[in-house]
Amino acid sequence: MGRADKVVLAYSGGVDTSVCIPYLKNEWGVKEVITLAADLGQGDELGPIQAKALRCGAVESLVTNAQEEFVTEYAFRAIKANALYENRYPLSTALARPLIAKLLVEAAEKYGADAVAHGCTAKGNDQVRFDLGILALNPNLKVLAPAREWNMSREETIAYGERCGVESPVKKSSPFSIDRNLLGRSIEAGPLEDPMTEPPEEIYLMTKAIADTPDTPEYVDIGFEKGIPVSLNGQTLDPVSLISQLNEKVGNHGVGRLDMIENRVVGIKSREIYEAPALLVLIDAHRDLESLTLTADVTQYKHGVGDTYSQLIYRGLWYSPLKTALDALIDQTQERVTGMVRVKLFKGNAVIVGRQSENSIYSANLSTYGSDDAFDHKAAEGFIYIWGLPTRVWAQKTK
């Protein structure tokens, strides 16, 4: 008896998920494999994917366009939270996983599958994100992870696929593992596993090398409504177009690259290369607008909220009660975060040079050092006396 009768497989068209199709059928006795590919802005990669899945042995190949949902329900929530994992990574790849898990569960329920499957390995983060997401949405579904159990190297996986008629889109001389969606790209493996190896320029597609960027700066005005980016240079755009256009503008100036050592969920350190031009600039601009419109205590408290939020996303806990509770808190803080932030793009830098909001709590009369200063200077001495009282008492008692 096989491990399942009908399986919905998360499908990317790459080596691992393509090999999963014959492996599930030949090794685990699965009768029917339905593949599901989520169109999250990968571009031309999804063109031949349906035909390839069928050639690999799938009985049906589904492609779901979820770009708008990806941006509005996942990316925009991360932006409102200022979510940067380990203060650097904007979670461009991680944000896609809970959405794919949701689509897998919906397809399994629609087609009467008793299991879902993915091609994640035992050392990666995505296995955790998929498994926990599926578990949270439908605990009755089995989760199959062939690549976690088959104990094959990448070369052996490619060879197994070739024996089963699976063509590989990756040349054996090109060892990089790449994931792409509308928000960005992640590149790992091969020579990049040496932390001292400089990434070759050819791995980058969304961002230009500094030497190839324009010699004049470009200014971009980013408009926000209640924490959500809605316009570029005064033009209101739909969510997908806004991300796409900003990716192009920002990447054209060499902004949006990350080269970092990150701590994976499973406890190992991994060297990762990321491109996320729009997402990085949007988080920076959003955080700046918050500084103009929110009180100091709310702004400071949100630093911790953003850190926790980023860890929940990274560790596969998108559908957790804590994340739901944090969403409610974040949404309340964003009621005032409406306005515009001006960003200067030039030679690998994105510098915020201006901001404005009808909800600004910045007071020029209080901040100025000019003649129209409205600050009561005489009040400072009394304030310092009260504020410093604990320090004074401590010093008196301990010196």
UniProtKB/Swiss-Prot annotation:
Entry GO CC: cytoplasm
Positions of L-aspartate binding: 121, 125-126
UniProt-annotated binding residues for L-citrulline: 89, 125, 129, 177, 186, 262, 274
Residues that, per the record, bind ATP: 10-18, 38, 119
Localization in the cell: Cytoplasm
Pathway(s) annotated for this protein in UniProt: Amino-acid biosynthesis; L-arginine biosynthesis; L-arginine from L-ornithine and carbamoyl phosphate: step 2/3
UniProt cross-references to InterPro entries, sorted A to Z: Arginosuc_syn_C, Arginosuc_syn_N, Arginosuc_synth, Arginosuc_synth_CS, Arginosuc_synth_type_1_subfam, AS_cat/multimer_dom_body, Rossmann-like_a/b/a_fold
PROSITE patterns: ARGININOSUCCIN_SYN_1, ARGININOSUCCIN_SYN_2
Pfam families: Arginosuc_syn_C (PF20979), Arginosuc_synth (PF00764)
GO MF annotation, one: ATP binding
Annotated coiled-coil segments of the chain: none
Reactions performed catalytically: L-citrulline + L-aspartate + ATP = 2-(N(omega)-L-arginino)succinate + AMP + diphosphate + H(+)
UniProt cross-references to HAMAP family, sorted A to Z: Arg_succ_synth_type1
PANTHER family: ARGININOSUCCINATE SYNTHASE
Subunit structure as annotated in this protein's UniProt entry: Homotetramer.
Family (UniProt): Belongs to the argininosuccinate synthase family. Type 1 subfamily.
Listed name of the protein: Argininosuccinate synthase
Organism in which the protein naturally occurs: Rippkaea orientalis (strain PCC 8801 / RF-1) (Cyanothece sp. (strain PCC 8801))
Gene designation: argG
